[in-house]
Amino acid sequence: MEMTQFSTPEQKLTSLGLILPHLPAPGGNYVSAKRVGDLVYLAGAVSTGPAGVIAGTAGAGSTIDDGYAAARACVLTQLAVLKRELGSLDRVAEVLSVNGYVNAAPGFGDSPAVINGASDLLIEVFGEAGRHVRTAVGVCALPRNALVEIQMTVRVRQS
């Protein structure tokens, strides 16, 4: 992890003025995280904020900037899941992959710019350990009309 004046991911989040959200129970018959060896697979997290789901359609009422912010909100949820699962974000050795889905109008081709919100935040929090492979696709609908959904896989340090 890149060394800065902020020695932990939690300190970096605080310095950015970001707070991990409260986690509701999964919305179906699944778990939010599944650990296999040193890997943690995270279920998709839709964009939510203090007022609930961040809904919308990119290219039809929602802008790239709206989507970028929604993708960041998804990552905050995923970090909250990881903290609950691992006890501390210090246990994250590296982010391996991010799959980003954007609720997009037909012809909207800027899904990568939207998902940059997720990628940028992960690198801000974890430094080079946050750099990952990625998929960014536009889809015709997401659960609860969410603007963005993010699924991630991370590698963890053994305790």
Which residues does each PLM region occupy?
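Short, polar/acidic, helix-capping and beta-turn segments at strand->helix junctions
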Residues: 2-159
